[in-house]
UniProtKB/Swiss-Prot annotation:
InterPro entries for this protein: SecY/SEC61-alpha (IPR002208), SecY_CS (IPR030659), SecY_dom_sf (IPR023201), Translocon_Sec61/SecY_plug_dom (IPR019561)
GO biological process, one term: protein transport
Lumenal side: 54-76, 139-144, 194-240, 310-354, 442-445
Native organism: Oncorhynchus mykiss (Rainbow trout)
This protein's UniProt keywords: Endoplasmic reticulum, Membrane, Protein transport, Translocation, Transmembrane, Transmembrane helix, Transport
Name of the molecule in the record: Protein transport protein Sec61 subunit alpha isoform B
């Protein structure tokens, strides 16, 4: 059934726009250039407002997810990477449940990736229609059918651009992937902005600067009681404070420390005697994939809940999914869940909130740990990184595990890889929860994604430099 399903959508995949694989080896300088161009296009799209919208000043239902999904409200990047990640989530779940089967051949992998791209485009159109029809840009009846269609087309074209930019980097023209690049850029931009923002906000305490560090100097300069000013800079409410900034730095350090945890399996050449090496299995075996997929799941739950609560407010089943409230304290107007599944799947706002509602905190912790472990373990089956796939790669390189026959390699690898994937996903979820409870800037999930992505780029940079030989020796 699985192969039949992929064969059915094969004709549609053939007409999709595609980036051709490079016919030659792309030099490191060219990769840096293409990566910079990709990032520039993304940042430009983040600043171009959607044409035809009447208003985007209403409470933002996806405020908490925008940093993670690299989206910017009221611009071409309204949807961000959400369609790509959602399509990946759907295809992974279908493959993990064996509803569709992905073979080991390059043809089957290419067909699977094509199906993922097709779903990405369909989801882009679907999300664009939902955003317009739920009144995020104004009442659809007031805007008219023509303007509504124009906004949907703009969002679809922008979504297609994101898909192609991601594919451009994935095919080897640039460094890393578009998804990782866009997420890391968005999160780092948020952290820097909340640390140094010169924007002033009117609070009950008077006019204050949004940026935590600028607020520190402003409070020390304007307040006569310096101790109280210092305390306010560290613990002020509803705006970024120095404790949030210190928590962010602390989480950065903890995640980088855990990145070094790994088990080295001894391997040897089956062809040349005396040639030994190691195969590393990292603690974060699936890297940040679990948290990206978990974010996609929650964001789509938010979309569905918001759409239903707008149309069917007061319905019991709709309220069971999520009830929402608006707030504008300490920043732009935003909607946040106050009941239902969406509430329990959202992080507590602070450590004080944990003490006020421990049941919420307990359910959130269980959800984060369970979903990250599940996504991590199922991802290895569809990404070519399971024990069977690793054994096949080692066999192709004529390498075997020391002390084991070639036929028993899969069994031995199965002792480590699924465990590393599940436990690594569990740790990723745990670190995200810890960062949320500490009040790190950009949410625990966002910080975790930023650190793992930056570390990935560091590893890519080291690898590229080492391949350049003498240049690598000079730099490292």
């Amino acid at each position: 059934m699985g192969i039949k399903f992929l064969e059915v959508i094969k004709p549609f995949c053939a007409v999709l726009p595609e980036i051709q694989k490079p016919e030659r080896k792309i030099q490191f300088r060219e990769k840096v250039l293409w990566t910079a161009i990709t990032l520039f296009i993304f940042l430009v799209c983040c600043q171009i407002p959607l044409f035809g919208i009447m208003s985007s000043d209403s409470a933002d239902p996806f405020y908490w997810m925008r940093v993670i999904l690299a989206s910017n409200r009221g611009t071409l990047m309204e949807l961000g990477i959400s369609p790509i990640v959602t399509s990946g989530l759907i295809m992974q779940l279908l493959a993990g449940a064996k509803i569709i089967e992905v073979g080991d051949t390059p043809k089957d992998r290419a067909l699977f990736n094509g199906a993922q791209k097709l779903f990405g485009m369909i989801i882009t159109i679907g999300q664009a229609i939902v955003y317009v029809m739920t009144g995020m840009y104004g009442d659809p009846s007031d805007m008219g059918a023509g303007i509504c269609l124009l906004i949907i087309i703009q969002l679809f074209v922008a979504g297609l651009i994101v898909l192609l930019l991601d594919e451009l980097l994935q095919k080897g023209y640039g460094l890393g992937s578009g998804i990782s690049l866009f997420i890391a850029t968005n999160i780092c931009e948020t952290i820097v902005w909340k640390a140094f923002s010169p924007t002033t906000v009117n609070t009950g305490r008077g006019t204050e600067f949004e940026g935590a560090i600028i607020a520190l100097f402003h409070l020390l300069a304007t307040r006569t009681d310096k101790v109280r000013a210092l305390r306010e800079a560290f613990y002020r409410q509803n705006l970024p404070n120095l404790m949030n900034l210190l928590a962010t730095v602390f989480v950065f350090g903890v995640v980088i420390y855990f990145q070094g945890f790994r088990v080295d399996l001894p391997i040897k050449s089956a062809r040349y005697r005396g040639q030994y090496n190691t195969y590393p299995i990292k603690l974060f075996y699936t890297s940040n994939i679990p948290i990206i997929l978990q974010s996609a799941l929650v964001s789509n739950l938010y979309v569905i809940s918001q759409m239903l609560s707008t149309r069917f407010s007061g319905n019991f089943l709709v309220n069971l999914l999520g009830t929402w409230s608006d707030t504008s304290s300490g920043g732009p107007a935003r909607a946040y869940p106050v009941g239902g599944l969406c509430y329990y799947f959202s992080p507590p706002e602070s450590f004080g909130s944990v003490l006020d509602d421990p049941i919420h905190a307990a359910i959130y912790i269980c959800f984060m740990l369970g979903s990250c472990a599940f996504f991590s373990k199922t991802w290895i089956e569809v990404s070519g990184s399971s024990a069977k796939d690793v054994a096949k790669q080692l066999k192709e390189q004529q390498m075997v595990m020391r002390g084991h026959r070639e036929t028993s390699m899969v069994h031995e690898l199965n002792r480590y890889i699924p465990t590393a994937a599940a436990f690594g996903g569990l740790c990723i979820g745990g670190l995200s929860v810890m960062a949320d409870f500490l009040g790190a800037i950009g949410s625990g999930t966002g910080i975790l994604l930023a650190v793992t992505i930056i570390y990935q780029y560091f590893e890519i940079f080291v690898k590229e430099q080492s391949e350049m030989g003498s240049m690598g020796a000079l730099l490292f």
